[in-house]
Amino acid sequence: VAAYGPLWNSGGERGIYKTTNGGKNWKRVLHISDHTGFNEVHLDPRNPDILYATSHQRQRKVWTYVSGGPESGLYKSLDGGENWIQLKNGIPGSDKGRFAIAISPVNPDVIYCMIEGHGFYKSLNRGASFNRESGHSTSGNYYVELFASPHDVNTIYSMDTYAQWSTDGGKSFKRLGEKGKHVDNHVAWIDPENPDHLILGCDGGLYETWDHASSWH
């Protein structure tokens, strides 16, 4: 699991944690610092020993919120989380905000990555290198979540105040329809048998569409 750590303080349980006995005991297998937590961990659907994790350096105080720093990044493990390498080829080297990634179910060699403050990136080789596709990114305090279509390798959904989607691998994004539903979207499910059947989770609850966002209930 990915652990962000305490909201208002440094330290605490931050990093990637692993259990091998159904949750009775946990071992921290990746840790950066007391100021940096982890917000996502993903498994390659073809090999459970291949994992990807995203770190986010942030500070939240009563008087300010700093979303980013040099310790935000993307990591990969080839041995079930025992050892990790940072993926840097094509990733900005300056201060970075929150990361989101999505592995394409159609072709798991393709990894999408959105970096707060930098844009939208794509890898065709399991993270060995990334190319910047566009400047699209969302607010790391609320969103920065991606969901790849199980039907088309070039279709990706980006959660935002108004949910957006791309059909060209992240080069451009357009809004989904929001008529009849609450905005502020955070999670999406795409039916693996029907690309027009979606469920979105937002601040107003769960909404379902059978006509690809033309109508919701």
Please describe what each predicted stretch is.
Residues 1-217:
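Beta-propeller blade termini and top-face loops
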